[in-house]
């Protein structure tokens, strides 16, 4: 086992604080409308330019192991805030730095660290309750656009795009961010259910100009099995041909003789057919087939429940107003499934989302809800260079998370004003002893830090602006972008309550643990390799140089 280096008391805390400050100072320059960029070097490719706090934090590793421990703990604050609300990482880092700095001063002055932590925790619990009381629901497009704009560093086009996307696909809809091809940002909305499987044969194409299969009012056959024998399908094909409607087959696979016969029938015009593979794999495929069945009012033909393809009738088939199949995607528009059945299925999936343990599962389930409930919107980010594209895409992602958080828990006045108002409301809070009172004061003072940092980044004097804001009430604050005072809600400067709440809770949680640290242990740096004394007798070989 490697030898350890151990530091105690003040020595440990000073080192830890230095690490906290290095990381926080790098992150906090990005805060606010006049925040600066940070350039991150990559081991390959061009450097990344970002204003995203968590991206900066993740890049920082310090050489001194004790300092690095401090930095890593603040990195945890940024990551947790990012996981919980998708934004507010810089605010969380600034809050954590302020609490740690003030808290360690109090510890150095002889206060009891555990009581300080209890005081900080008490203040945060009270502050969270006050934040909830200040929160205003965020339901209209204008407010959603404002939240998106602020989170995307005052880029109005991003805010408007996100609001438009939410209008089109609903608050629960899936909105994804992709690289665009031009200079402008674009919004693509896919109505209906789309999945990433295309036609099994190009001979099904009936729109050569677009290279797509478009079928109006088709029947939809859903089979949880491979179809290779055409005999199994003859009864269904004959019934569909009599009905004079097209047929879409969605199955695990359609191959060999079955696929060849379908192609021949289509080309001869006997019956219009298109076949695609079912989306997903394993249990997820079964679930998605069931989703499509619910949406189209059909039944999944599955041998697991004793259904055979030969015995399928028109009643077992789903229907939709239109189906469009491309090389890579299939879109089902206006399925005829009953609204009550669709809502029941959505509720069932939402229950699974609550119980899901992995982010991946949660994301996939959320996609299924969106496909059933509304549709999918894709924001295509346009930029002149790849470096700009990466930076802008990160901002759009942040803005998207912020708007979702705003819809979930409402909004409060932005620009650090909400925390200043909350601190004023709980100023009379007291603990069980003097040390706890100091802890409460530490937390209250830290709540001003985001406002001060925004002002500092804008090149103004933080103390002057903070005093002016504290002299006002309600939503009165300072707009750092235009350098004027007024109502933050009227200025359109809003922060999602969830983002502010998460930032404060995670910052206080980690900072409280750091204040109560008394000892730090790390591996000793490995020394130089030991001198191989045994090889000393071979020195005479140096003379071999003359033989060259």
Curated annotation (Swiss-Prot):
It is an enzyme of class 5 (isomerase). It is found in: Cytoplasm. GO terms for molecular function: ATP binding; ATP-dependent protein folding chaperone; isomerase activity; unfolded protein binding. The keyword Chaperone applies. Its EC number is 5.6.1.7. The keyword DNA-binding does not apply. CDD domains: GroEL (cd03344). Keywords: ATP-binding, Chaperone, Cytoplasm, Isomerase, Nucleotide-binding. It holds the Pfam family Cpn60_TCP1. PROSITE patterns: CHAPERONINS_CPN60 (PS00296). ATP binds at residues 30-33, 51, 87-91, 415, 479-481, 495. One of its GO terms (cellular component) is cytoplasm. It catalyses: ATP + H2O + a folded polypeptide = ADP + phosphate + an unfolded polypeptide. One of its GO terms (biological process) is protein refolding. HAMAP family: CH60 (MF_00600). Together with its co-chaperonin GroES, plays an essential role in assisting protein folding. The GroEL-GroES system forms a nano-cage that allows encapsulation of the non-native substrate proteins and provides a physical environment optimized to promote and accelerate protein folding. Forms a cylinder of 14 subunits composed of two heptameric rings stacked back-to-back. Interacts with the co-chaperonin GroES. Belongs to the chaperonin (HSP60) family. This is Chaperonin GroEL. The gene is groEL.
């Amino acid at each position: 086992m490697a030898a350890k280096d151990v530091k105690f008391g003040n020595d440990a805390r000073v080192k830890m604080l230095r690490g906290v400050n290095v990381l926080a100072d790098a992150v906090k320059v990005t805060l606010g409308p006049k925040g600066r960029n940070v350039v991150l070097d990559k081991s390959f490719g061009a450097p990344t330019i970002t204003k995203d706090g968590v991206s900066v934090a993740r890049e920082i590793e310090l050489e001194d192991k004790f300092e690095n421990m401090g930095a890593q703990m603040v990195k945890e604050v940024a990551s947790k805030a990012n996981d919980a609300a998708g934004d507010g990482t810089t605010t969380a880092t600034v809050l954590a730095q302020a609490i740690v700095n003030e808290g360690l001063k109090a510890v150095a002055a002889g206060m009891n660290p555990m009581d300080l932590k209890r005081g900080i925790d008490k203040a945060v619990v009270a502050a969270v309750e006050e934040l909830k009381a200040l929160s205003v629901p965020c339901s209209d497009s204008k407010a959603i656009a404002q939240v998106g704009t602020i989170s995307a560093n005052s880029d109005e086009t991003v805010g408007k795009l996100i609001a438009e996307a939410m209008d089109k696909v609903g608050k629960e809809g899936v909105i994804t961010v992709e690289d665009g091809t031009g200079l402008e940002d674009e919004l693509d909305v896919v109505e209906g259910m789309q999945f990433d499987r295309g036609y099994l044969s190009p001979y099904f194409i009936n729109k050569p100009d677009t290279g797509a299969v478009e079928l109006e009012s088709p029947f939809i056959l859903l089979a949880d099995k491979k179809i290779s024998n055409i005999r199994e399908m003859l009864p269904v094909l004959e019934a569909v041909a009599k009905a004079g409607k097209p047929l879409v087959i969605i199955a695990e696979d359609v191959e060999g003789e079955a696929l060849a016969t379908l192609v021949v029938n289509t080309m001869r015009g006997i019956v219009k057919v298109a076949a695609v593979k079912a989306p997903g794999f394993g249990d997820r495929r079964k679930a998605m087939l069931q989703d499509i069945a619910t949406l189209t009012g059909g039944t999944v033909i599955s041998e697991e429940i004793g259904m055979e393809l030969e015995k399928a009738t028109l009643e077992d088939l789903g229907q939709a107003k239109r189906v469009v199949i491309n090389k890579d995607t299939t879109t089902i528009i206006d399925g005829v499934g009953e609204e009550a059945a669709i809502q029941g299925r959505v509720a069932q999936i939402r229950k699974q989302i609550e119980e899901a343990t992995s982010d991946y599962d949660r994301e996939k389930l959320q996609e299924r809800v969106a496909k059933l409930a509304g549709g999918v919107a894709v924001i295509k980010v346009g930029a002149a260079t790849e470096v700009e594209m990466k930076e802008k895409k990160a901002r759009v992602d942040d803005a998207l998370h912020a708007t979702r958080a705003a819809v979930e828990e409402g909004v409060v006045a932005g620009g650090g004003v909400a925390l200043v108002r909350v601190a004023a409301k709980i100023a009379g809070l007291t603990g069980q002893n003097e040390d706890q009172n100091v802890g409460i004061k530490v937390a209250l003072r830290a709540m001003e830090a985001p406002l001060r940092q925004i002002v500092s980044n804008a090149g103004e004097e933080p103390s002057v602006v903070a005093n002016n804001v504290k002299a006002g009430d309600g939503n009165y604050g300072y707009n750092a972008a235009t350098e004027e005072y007024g109502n933050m809600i009227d200025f359109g400067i809003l922060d999602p309550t969830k983002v502010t709440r998460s930032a404060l809770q995670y910052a206080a949680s980690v900072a409280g643990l750091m204040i109560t640290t008394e000892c730090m242990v790390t591996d000793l740096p490995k020394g130089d390799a030991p001198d191989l004394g045994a090889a000393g007798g071979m020195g005479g070989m140096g003379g071999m140089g003359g033989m060259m």
